Amino acid sequence: MSLYRDEGVVLRTSKLGEADRIITILTRGHGKIRAVAKGVRRTKSRFGARLEPFMRVDVLIAEGRSLDVVSQAEAVAAYGAPIAADYAAYEAANVIVETIDKIASTEHEQLPNQYRLLIGALNALAKQSHAPQAIGDSYVMRALALAGWTPRLGTCVVCGKAEPAYLSIASGGVMCEADHTTDARRIAPFVLNQFDALIRGDWSVLDAAPVERVVQELVEDWGEYYLERPIRSLRLIDS
């Protein structure tokens, strides 16, 4: 049985049998993996709380026939405790891990840039660097951008004029008055500015005012359209 070591973030867990769990981890070098942590649900488990969601861990993995097995796990950064202590941060963290879980649809596909973005977002939540809602919304848009779904916001996607008046999610960006389609929604300059700031991670803009409800809805709709399924944690926050 061959072994490999990597650093990763625990995205989610699910029960297996009476004492085990399947741990889903986004790793730095091996992409998303699913591995069994044996005995982790026992009171005296050798893993302790190191394999809980939002934990950043160094893991030693044994390759298995159907599922790999976690042999060792050491904490690198305990994001879980400070995030769980603040409900808004906890909600945002759930949005973040659900988003990357959906983006990383193929196991073992290396996603180093996505991994760095994930670490940055969870670290910001744990340190309360910015408003949790803004961190979560910005993460969603930046993760989608890394996956290839960046909205075109500067010029009309039809004619190229720098006269953005509408936004069409299906067309991938803004449209001018003359060329907008029936699905496009009118977008005010301040909404466009805040939406753009989320994508760029411009905290000078995002720290100045809470993310507007209409902008939150744009993030939710953009994610659902390009992932082809809703980000349920985001929908719960926005409801």
Curated annotation (Swiss-Prot):
Keyword Nucleotide-binding: no
PANTHER family cross-referenced by the UniProt entry: DNA REPAIR PROTEIN RECO
Acyltransferase recorded as keyword: no
Primary gene name: recO
Species in which this protein is naturally found: Bifidobacterium longum (strain NCC 2705)
Protein name: DNA repair protein RecO
Secretion signal span: none
GO biological process terms, semicolon-separated: DNA recombination; double-strand break repair
This protein's UniProt keywords: DNA damage, DNA recombination, DNA repair
